[in-house]
Amino acid sequence: MKPLAAPANHGVLGQQEKQSLPADFTKLHLTDSLHPQVTHVSSSHSGCSITSDSGSSSLSDIYQATESEAGDMDLSGLPETAVDSEDDDDEEDIERASDPLMSRDIVRDCLEKDPIDRTDDDIEQLLEFMHQLPAFANMTMSVRRELCAVMVFAVVERAGTIVLNDGEELDSWSVILNGSVEVTYPDGKAEILCMGNSFGVSPTMDKEYMKGVMRTKVDDCQFVCIAQQDYCRILNQVEKNMQKVEEEGEIVMVKEHRELDRTGTRKGHIVIKGTSERLTMHLVEEHSVVDPTFIEDFLLTYRTFLSSPMEVGKKLLEWFNDPSLRDKVTRVVLLWVNNHFNDFEGDPAMTRFLEEFENNLEREKMGGHLRLLNIACAAKAKRRLMTLTKPSREAPLPFILLGGSEKGFGIFVDSVDSCSKATEAGLKRGDQILEVNGQNFENIQLSKAMEILRNNTHLSITVKTNLFVFKELLTRLSEEKRNGAPHLPKIGDIKKASRYSIPDLAVDVEQVIGLEKVNKKSKANTVGGRNKLKKILDKTRISILPQKPYNDIGIGQSQDDSIVGLRQTKHIPAALPVSGTLSSSNPDLLQSHHRILDFSTTPDLPDQVLRVFKADQQSRYIMISKDTTAKEVVIQAIREFAVTATPEQYSLCEVSVTPEGVIKQRRLPDQLSKLADRIQLSGRYYLKNNMETETLCSDEDAQELLRESQISLLQLSTVEVATQLSMRNFELFRNIEPTEYIDDLFKLKSKTSCANLKKFEEVINQETFWVASEILRETNQLKRMKIIKHFIKIALHCRECKNFNSMFAIISGLNLAPVARLRTTWEKLPNKYEKLFQDLQDLFDPSRNMAKYRNVLSGQNLQPPVIPLFPVIKKDLTFLHEGNDSKVDGLVNFEKLRMIAKEIRHVGRMASVNMDPALMFRTRKKKWRSLGSLSQGSANATVLDVAQTGGHKKRVRRSSFLNAKKLYEDAQMARKVKQYLSNLELEMDEESLQTLSLQCEPATSTLPKNPGDKKPVKSETSPVAPRAGPQQKVQPQQPLAQPQPPHKVSQGLQVPAVSLYPSRKKVPVKDLPPFGINSPQALKKILSLSEEGSLERHRKQAEDTISNASSQLSSPPTSPQSSPRKGYALALSGTVDNFSDSGHSEISSRSSIVSNSSFDSVPVSLHDERRQRHSVSIVESNLGVGRMERRTLMEPDQYSLGSYAPVSESRGLYAAATVISSPSTEELSHDQGDRASLDAADSGRGSWTSCSSGSHDNIQTIQHQRSWETLPFGHTHFDYSGDAASIWASGGHMDQMMFSDHSTKYNRQNQSRESLEQAQSRASWASSTGYWGEDSEGDTGTIKRRGGKDVSAEAESSSMVPVTTEEAKPVPMPAHIAVTPSTTKGLIARKEGRYREPPPTPPGYVGIPIADFPEGPCHPARKPPDYNVALQRSRMVARPTEAPAPGQTPPAAAASRPGSKPQWHKPSDADPRLAPFQPQGFAGAEEDEDEQVSAV
């Protein structure tokens, strides 16, 4: 189940303040399967593909060129044109990624259908989308489903439109999906309703009237409306569907009758709520077909309403005595042990319960069930490490052992002295000893084991409960006593069972194979003998196992989910067996196959290589397996070296060199295994003659060893780094117990304290700061660029490994402000890597609740292992928890718990693999050319996956026999990577990173300081938006804005990817009648809104769809936004600092994690009444001015996924000039607006944690800075009445929980610094990087001027998460700021050292100077051509080396913009609008310099 709500950004109704609301519903649509009808999923459909779907990866050349077999060769110095033929492919792929197909908004499509045309699938889509809105809180799923079936979609385009008048009769119940409305009551009070809130009739047919006047606050408000009659019918029908169970006059349980489809075949009663006692009793009652997962859901979530598991345990033992309930009780216990064995381990009371239950099963002769129980315990038991010390070697052992390889078993504990230290350490009967002091005990003779245990006083013992095999051992021993001879079973001894469940098959076959091997080579019959078993399972899996493989259910859906009636949207070939498919009497005991068949053990084939030296420094490569012992290696080495001696005369020694140069030598025990994993980089294995005392390693060799062990990132293979990261992440992810999610979510105390969950949470921080630390510690600029390139490649490989967590962390690290500001370093990055990086960022586009990422995650080809982005998981769970009450009418709300359990099951399924994940990641990395695509979107990727995890793997192994040296070098690279990752020194302090960044590329200041300015303490610590293309220097004394010739730019990083979704512009509806019933018929207005919206949407789709490629390949220096417009800059007393590049283009970080600073240009069609505006540029007089000591208060949302970089710091840096005065309200299409995320750039603190669903969180509320617009002339009026914190919607707060350590560090210590300069400096900033088309998004919490009216944002806060009072203190702001007419026409400039020059202007986009353009409404004919078209033309037109002279119009420009008179304009010194800036040394620039200022 995939909850799709996102963190809140708007106000909530009344007591629902604690509930979080989705940020923007257009950003929150479902992405389960964009194209169910498409079998060939092209890269554009995948949402993240950077390659084509042609069947051979367009990136293969990169990997051929850069991933040499021995490691990673850097060929960046070679001429790119000759080698990098994939450039063209990449460009083509990036263009394909902007395929309009990607813009399908499934939920929107479903909403726009006529209700009678909606299918069951459509209703499920809407249900999943709507079910977390506060308006639907505490409604049952069936009521929500009914409402979704009849709802009508309506859109009100303009802000300020009256929706309902006071006293108007209401005819519907409506829910706001996007935007916000304000209700003004007759007494003057006002209330703001935001996304997720509802208004309208109550569920009666009585006439009701509107109180107050309702107006839209923002453009593009979207509603769903349910007619009064339907609403009344559905809600009243609920009562009829409810079955209330009463005891002694009190309601103890409420069930609801549900029909899961329209066929009527799946219907029954499902538990909605009940008392804890009654819910427990329901465990052994009959469950209907619509509630198949009640037991699993209960066993996972009982801890939220019961204080102890023994409350359930006692009842189960009591019910076991009732023969009619016995089978059901047994099933519950089996499921409990199988799903949550951690409830029993370490809990003495529960362990006793389990023992008592086993005794009951034995007493009742329920052998089959007992066997299943033992299998489950063995499969689910965790390894435990305990340390024992003996006073002396002669001291007796406090336990008795059984087994040994001579009997075909491992070493088991038969009894433990009751008062010994071993008992205290947790050793108990039935434990299998796996390892002692590093020596493997799984295949060892009992006498040898006893010898090792006796000869050591310090014992580090790894054990695991394995009652199943222990009981087999006891049975065997008793048989031997009776028969007087050891019994070696043959294959025919397999128990003749009529039917094998998965566990039966697995362990029986395993047992036989293990015992059969005894004659040939002693092999423990533990959960081992596993390799042949796996082969048999591989061959028999599809035919023997129940036929419900992934092609029926997929990762996101188990058998139980499909019964419950969830859509089956994922079609995955039948490659892997799946849990949850056994009959109800034999519950699935192999939910995670690796748990029972220890799949983490690699095959028993010689797939590892050791390099063994002799004293004369000769060496040989020896093939071994993981279980090969040191003694066996000696035998092989003697054979390889052709030594004529017996193995007893030689031993294996490990020689290692410490960092100080000390040579250490030790003899390895004969039984030591896992030799390939134990050797260090600074160590070697030597074959030593026991009779001689020769020096094995000379000082020179030791120095060489030491040198080899010193590694840097650039020496490492990117494929191997990605593989190791993925293995490490997957191991952490797989170890998270389902109960940990519950404990963490409900803040429950548990014995494990969610340790695994915390580790997985923390890894994303570590990897983010690892990237920044590695880059910023490199002083050489060229090497720094290579490191960036290296990380981009690692992120690409992480995507190939489906490791989204590390991929996101690396992207976030590259976007941390200290890294992002390294302009000259980024300029050196080859274009293809910029484009690849852009594409990687695009996958994590936060808009629409991370729709692109979710698309990929739920894609048809995605099989486990998958490492999902953890903050998204956490956000989804938090929404379910906080959006629904835990108790309703005094009863436990089990419907809520069922939703949470389903989400946790879905997450857990991503980690359920049936083979060693290391092997999966490794085979994956070999398949570039066959897979066809780096993304998971390639049509035949899955089939190839399946084929190649078998076939290709063998090919690798076959070649390894031929080339042991190659295999050794691969293993050595893996060792290097492991050592590198384990020895990382991370710089987690942002201040230190910023200092390092300034040392790499010092800040430069070329502009004089304004005398009246108060300079902040630091001028250059502010994080900046990522690179924006090479810039040209501003020369202080040259006239402003000389025409600049277009320059070649690096194309990938300068512009964030533009939205791939079409804009949702709707025709203005100011002339439509209001919502009320004065329309000729009920709902007429709603329907007309809906229809008109739909028509307009299709009409404008082509016009407004923006090409992803356009943003990456070219962004004009002059403003191509619609027609010319005036962007009035506020240059108050020189405080305008750090403007975005020439103020010309759309702020749209569709894909950037920290948005890039050169903006996308978005064509927007204008209406006649639209005012002409120009973006103009001003140059700041002093680099430090307005630069605050902004170690900002991290609000919960600044940790939100939407706000990839907390914006508070640098939002101010893009000064007011980019804010556009908007008397008209159609500035940008909605979608473009809501993707226009900031050029964000805080230090990136929090960029990784992001969890918010809406990209407009990015620009949502700039902490302590309000976005305001200047009036065309005169004063700008501030109406700041909201407190700073409340403006943010804090849906991302769960990340604050996750990563709170990092945020609080700054919260307190910097408040004082914050306030010092707010009054002087913050007041003069416009947080311009809010939206360019800010009118289209009302939830940004900014104060807007629409249609000449100031709109205050104070109540738009709506966070479900309460903001603490400390964080929510209002910040003093000046009430008025004087803006003179001259300052309002200031110009934007970019500060040197932060931005790069914008890309060349496509033909057809030429700036129109202010002086030459008349004020007032524009001519309707003035409209730019489609930007994509212009862009395509620009590629075919030779770029001039000289800028056109004033008065000249390029022919393409003239042709493409009829009616306009574009020309370059050099403002005269006398131009009054520039007067205030003349003394500040505004400069034009020469073409060969680094920063460019363009005046439009």
Curated annotation (Swiss-Prot):
<dbReference type="GO" id="GO:0005886">
    <property type="term" value="C:plasma membrane"/>
</dbReference>
<dbReference type="GO" id="GO:0098794">
    <property type="term" value="C:postsynapse"/>
</dbReference>
<dbReference type="GO" id="GO:0005085">
    <property type="term" value="F:guanyl-nucleotide exchange factor activity"/>
</dbReference>
<dbReference type="GO" id="GO:0048022">
    <property type="term" value="P:negative regulation of melanin biosynthetic process"/>
</dbReference>
<feature type="modified residue" description="Phosphoserine; by PLK2">
    <location>
        <position position="933"/>
    </location>
</feature>
<comment type="function">
    <text>Functions as a guanine nucleotide exchange factor (GEF), which activates Rap and Ras family of small GTPases by exchanging bound GDP for free GTP in a cAMP-dependent manner. Serves as a link between cell surface receptors and Rap/Ras GTPases in intracellular signaling cascades. Also acts as an effector for Rap1 by direct association with Rap1-GTP thereby leading to the amplification of Rap1-mediated signaling. Shows weak activity on HRAS. It is controversial whether RAPGEF2 binds cAMP and cGMP or not.</text>
</comment>
<comment type="subunit">
    <text>Found in a complex, at least composed of KIDINS220, MAGI2, NTRK1 and RAPGEF2; the complex is mainly formed at late endosomes in a neuronal growth factor (NGF)-dependent manner. Interacts (via C-terminal domain) with NEDD4 (via WW domains); this interaction leads to ubiquitination and degradation via the proteasome pathway in a cAMP-independent manner. Interacts with MAGI1 (via PDZ domain). Interacts with ADRB1 (via C-terminal PDZ motif); the interaction is direct. Interacts (via Ras-associating domain) with RAP1A (via GTP-bound active form).</text>
</comment>
<keyword id="KW-0832">Ubl conjugation</keyword>
<feature type="modified residue" description="Phosphothreonine; by PLK2">
    <location>
        <position position="644"/>
    </location>
</feature>
<keyword id="KW-0221">Differentiation</keyword>
<feature type="compositionally biased region" description="Low complexity">
    <location>
        <begin position="1110"/>
        <end position="1124"/>
    </location>
</feature>
<dbReference type="GO" id="GO:0005911">
    <property type="term" value="C:cell-cell junction"/>
</dbReference>
<dbReference type="InterPro" id="IPR023578">
    <property type="entry name" value="Ras_GEF_dom_sf"/>
</dbReference>
<feature type="modified residue" description="Phosphoserine">
    <location>
        <position position="1158"/>
    </location>
</feature>
<dbReference type="GO" id="GO:1901888">
    <property type="term" value="P:regulation of cell junction assembly"/>
</dbReference>
<dbReference type="GO" id="GO:0043005">
    <property type="term" value="C:neuron projection"/>
</dbReference>
<dbReference type="Pfam" id="PF00617">
    <property type="entry name" value="RasGEF"/>
</dbReference>
<feature type="modified residue" description="Phosphoserine">
    <location>
        <position position="1094"/>
    </location>
</feature>
<dbReference type="GO" id="GO:0031697">
    <property type="term" value="F:beta-1 adrenergic receptor binding"/>
</dbReference>
<dbReference type="GO" id="GO:2001214">
    <property type="term" value="P:positive regulation of vasculogenesis"/>
</dbReference>
<feature type="modified residue" description="Phosphoserine">
    <location>
        <position position="1115"/>
    </location>
</feature>
<feature type="region of interest" description="Disordered">
    <location>
        <begin position="1002"/>
        <end position="1051"/>
    </location>
</feature>
<keyword id="KW-0967">Endosome</keyword>
<feature type="region of interest" description="Disordered">
    <location>
        <begin position="1303"/>
        <end position="1369"/>
    </location>
</feature>
<feature type="compositionally biased region" description="Acidic residues">
    <location>
        <begin position="83"/>
        <end position="94"/>
    </location>
</feature>
<dbReference type="InterPro" id="IPR014710">
    <property type="entry name" value="RmlC-like_jellyroll"/>
</dbReference>
<feature type="domain" description="Ras-GEF">
    <location>
        <begin position="717"/>
        <end position="944"/>
    </location>
</feature>
<dbReference type="GO" id="GO:0048167">
    <property type="term" value="P:regulation of synaptic plasticity"/>
</dbReference>
<dbReference type="GO" id="GO:0032486">
    <property type="term" value="P:Rap protein signal transduction"/>
</dbReference>
<feature type="compositionally biased region" description="Polar residues">
    <location>
        <begin position="1306"/>
        <end position="1330"/>
    </location>
</feature>
<dbReference type="GO" id="GO:0038180">
    <property type="term" value="P:nerve growth factor signaling pathway"/>
</dbReference>
<feature type="compositionally biased region" description="Low complexity">
    <location>
        <begin position="1030"/>
        <end position="1041"/>
    </location>
</feature>
<dbReference type="InterPro" id="IPR000595">
    <property type="entry name" value="cNMP-bd_dom"/>
</dbReference>
<dbReference type="GO" id="GO:0099159">
    <property type="term" value="P:regulation of modification of postsynaptic structure"/>
</dbReference>
<feature type="modified residue" description="Phosphoserine; by PLK2">
    <location>
        <position position="1022"/>
    </location>
</feature>
<feature type="region of interest" description="Disordered">
    <location>
        <begin position="40"/>
        <end position="59"/>
    </location>
</feature>
<feature type="modified residue" description="Phosphoserine">
    <location>
        <position position="1119"/>
    </location>
</feature>
<feature type="compositionally biased region" description="Polar residues">
    <location>
        <begin position="1246"/>
        <end position="1256"/>
    </location>
</feature>
<dbReference type="GO" id="GO:0005737">
    <property type="term" value="C:cytoplasm"/>
</dbReference>
<dbReference type="GO" id="GO:0045860">
    <property type="term" value="P:positive regulation of protein kinase activity"/>
</dbReference>
<dbReference type="GO" id="GO:2000481">
    <property type="term" value="P:positive regulation of cAMP-dependent protein kinase activity"/>
</dbReference>
<feature type="domain" description="PDZ">
    <location>
        <begin position="385"/>
        <end position="470"/>
    </location>
</feature>
